[in-house]
Amino acid sequence: YCQELRYPYYAHGMSQVLSSRGGDFTGITNGIDTKLFDPMTTEGLAAHYNEKTFKEGKLQNKLALQKTLGLPEDRDTAMLAMVTRLAGHKGIDLLCYIAERLMSRRVQLVVIGTGEEKYEWFLRGLQERFGRQVSVNLCFSADLANVVYAGADLYLMPSKSEPCGLS
């Protein structure tokens, strides 16, 4: 991302300043902060796991999350998750665009977040239409987010621009 910021298109008017920094301008990549979320020690998980036990641990957390959210408990259904602000630059409009096709597949979608009213309304409607596949949680809860990180099969982050910030 730091290389992209050297181009005017991505830099929001700051490309010259950022380019002038030369080699001391670096990027920090996204990822889960293991000080805040560690599947071996985070409280509130159905099962703790590490790189050797993750298959069984993820499955136990997934089944527990499905039960908690009122979704059918199905180990073979792909669970997609988003923990995000519901804002255009976070790519929520991309989810809106593919939602119909996505729901025609064997998937469950879990969304946690708040934001622009139009996206909240869209997600509420999606949950009404596909309630056995969709759980929309218009809030932010670090505890629920941790359970989602522990149990989801895939994490969606369709940001149009993500300056190595928060998910």
Language-model features: locations:
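Catalytic cores of nucleotide-sugar-dependent glycosyltransferases that transfer UDP/GDP/TDP-activated
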Residues: 1-167
